[in-house]
Amino acid sequence: MSRFKFIDIGINLTDPMFRGIYRGVQKHQDDLQDVIGRAVEIGVKKFMITGGNLQDSKDALHLAQTNGMFFSTVGCHPTRCGEFEKNNPDLYLKELLNLAENNKGKVVAIGECGLDFDRLQFCPKDTQLKYFEKQFELSEQTKLPMFLHCRNSHAEFLDIMKRNRDRCVGGVVHSFDGTKEAAAALIDLDLYIGFNGCSLKTEANLEVLKSIPSEKLMIETDAPWCGVKSTHAGSKYIRTAFPTKKKWESGHCLKDRNEPCHIIQILEIMSAVRDEDPLELANTLYNNTIKVFFPGI
């Protein structure tokens, strides 16, 4: 029994990789239950399965309904906001709203929504700006917190957030890789900051991590993406290794697929960089997440 308890605030459990499917081809057997088992063993108590568009949000909810530890989000990722305009925008928003409103208890956040100016090839800036702001209607009506995404778009993100902050009960900016100043501005809006492997790549990232009060931090894996690579500045602080194979084998992690069990490695980096006791920090991160996303517990 692990002495730690975690809530993975961002996990893409609907990704076909956890079913053994890569680029549409079945490469190995479905091992989702093994993946969950490894995570539970190291102390993951709740999994927040992210919704990236309407269909993905439906799939995330459907999966969340199969396990008492699973919860989900409902929203549209900035790179997929073009879907609003491919359909009837008001109807698309209404369907997202109905999905969240009718499944409270399993749906714990609105998102993933925000801005991503690193990947404008998937969705132009104006479309992202318009439909990020539009999704505050979901948060306002459901009274659910937001699961937020901000990539290379801090000024515009902050502008929209300030204008609409009173329309949402709170939220977390996940997979944070911004500056100390950006983090401080988000904390001034009483938002939380989520860290995963993508947040721990450089020494500058680690300095940002040190600057954030522990009562404003959350932890995530964003698996199967955002694993900690050996080239990442944070990797030197990892103490826990998992049996890993380059080619899939039952009972082992797979080399290039991040898993929720790796959340222990994120904690090890965070606690070492911040010079904090790992157990104390884990408890703080857990309590922060309960406060925002599971207030009824």
UniProtKB/Swiss-Prot annotation:
PROSITE patterns reported for this sequence: TATD_3 (PS01091)
Residues the record lists as N6-succinyllysine modifications: 27, 46
KW Lipid metabolism (keyword) present: no
Amino-acid positions noted as binding a divalent metal cation 2 in the UniProt annotation, renumbered to this chain: 112, 149, 174
Subcellular location: Nucleus
InterPro entries linked to this entry: DNase_TatD-rel_CS, Metal_Hydrolase, TatD-like, TatD-type_Hydrolase
Molecular function (Gene Ontology), one example: 3'-5'-DNA exonuclease activity
Positions bound to a divalent metal cation 1: 112, 222
Coiled-coil stretches noted in the UniProt entry, renumbered to this chain: none
Cofactor, how bound (note): Binds 2 divalent metal cations per subunit.
CDD domains, A to Z: TatD_DNAse (cd01310)
Keywords in alphabetical order: Hydrolase, Metal-binding, Nuclease, Nucleus
Keyword Isomerase (UniProt): no
GO cellular component: mitochondrion; nucleoplasm
Predominant subcellular localization, coarse grouping: nucleus
EC number: 3.1.21.-
Cofactor: a divalent metal cation
Family per similarity comment: Belongs to the metallo-dependent hydrolases superfamily. TatD-type hydrolase family.
Function, in words: Deoxyribonuclease which catalyzes (in vitro) the decatenation of kinetoplast DNA, which are circular DNA catenated to each other, producing linear DNA molecules. Plays an important role in chromosomal segregation and cell cycle progression during eye development probably via its DNA decatenation activity.
Protein name stated in the entry: Deoxyribonuclease TATDN1
The species this protein was found in: Homo sapiens (Human)
Gene: TATDN1
